[in-house]
């Protein structure tokens, strides 16, 4: 099963009864007035967004972290560059410049979130709180190209919501096995290879472990309390994060790992996309002025003197 089929099967269809991976799911129905707003909320911003540390956690297709020698990382001047040759879950579930927003004929002309200068639909620079993406890394998981579900904010979503699937069970086993024994048995190894294969990542997880430098990993799951974990355990946690993000489990994981404790001793400043090297050019107004970034209450992006 490919990552693309993950999206098609359990992220973008109303019934999930015929999807073996999904063990428990919630059904929605416009006829029963049980609907949601996820399609529209992933189409526009939702006053949220993934952090730079999160996107950096995804491996390259060759299994190496982005900072490792020979990784092939293309940098972060554009969102498409960030996603290039990476774990296919990052490619699929985070919006980039080349992703079309509307392809359903009912929507009219196909559009993109990040397009040519003056022709962008991105919600990075809007001052409207409920439709802005505050980091530039806009979530795309559960988006559907069925325009009837995303034409407005009137709770038109009817696609099903997976609650528990076999991938989570596999990750649970991997983590428990390593925490209990300090090693991975044949079953855990097989699960890990299967998850990586489906994500388009080299199945040799030892390549990743050997190339991991915890001092260059910006994610909280590096820590249990304020103590760094082993590179093996961190990579098991990385796999869990990269597989299950946007599925409502992240906060619980960080709590049970006591990863938030690190903030008791170290300041944490969330970072977003690299805006000021290249991306800003798509947000100039007709006079060539960049978005307001002077630190005042109505500024819409951070100053280029403080960040990229």
Regions found by a protein language model. Give the residues of each.
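Acidic/polar-rich alpha-helix caps and helix-coil junctions
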Residues: 1-42, 68-308
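Active-site core of glycosidic bond-cleaving carbohydrate-active enzymes
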Residues: 25, 47, 51-53
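Active-site-adjacent helix-turn-beta-strand microarchitecture at beta-sheet edges
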Residues: 60
């Amino acid at each position: 099963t490919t990552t693309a089929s993950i999206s098609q099967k359990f992220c973008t269809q109303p019934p999930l009864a015929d999807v073996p991976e999904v063990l428990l799911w919630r059904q929605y129905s416009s006829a029963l007035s049980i609907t949601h707003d996820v399609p529209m909320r992933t189409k526009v911003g939702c006053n949220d967004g993934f952090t730079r540390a999160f996107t950096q956690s995804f491996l390259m297709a060759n299994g190496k972290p982005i900072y490792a020698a020979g990784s092939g990382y293309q940098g972060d001047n554009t969102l498409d560059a960030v996603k290039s040759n990476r774990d296919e879950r990052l490619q699929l579930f985070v919006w980039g410049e080349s992703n079309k927003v509307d392809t359903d004929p009912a929507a009219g002309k196909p559009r993109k979130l990040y397009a040519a200068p003056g022709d962008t639909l991105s919600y990075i620079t809007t001052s409207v709180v409920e439709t802005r993406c505050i980091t530039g890394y806009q979530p795309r998981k559960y988006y559907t190209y069925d325009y009837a579900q995303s034409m407005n904010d009137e709770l038109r979503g009817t696609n099903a919501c997976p609650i528990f699937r076999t991938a989570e069970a596999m990750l649970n086993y991997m983590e428990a096995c390593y925490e209990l024994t300090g090693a991975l048995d044949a079953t855990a190894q097989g699960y890990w290879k299967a998850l990586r294969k489906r994500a388009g990542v080299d199945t040799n997880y030892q390549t990743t472990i050997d190339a991991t430098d915890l001092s260059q990993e910006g994610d909280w799951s590096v820590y249990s309390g304020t103590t760094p974990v082993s590179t093996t355990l961190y990579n098991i946690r990385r796999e869990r994060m990269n597989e299950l993000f946007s599925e409502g489990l992240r906060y619980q994981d960080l709590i049970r790992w006591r990863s938030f404790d690190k903030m008791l001793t170290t300041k944490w400043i969330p970072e977003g996309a690299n805006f000021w090297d290249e991306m800003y050019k798509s947000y100039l107004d007709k006079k060539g002025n960049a978005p307001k970034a002077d630190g005042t209450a109505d500024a819409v992006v951070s100053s280029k003197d403080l960040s990229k």
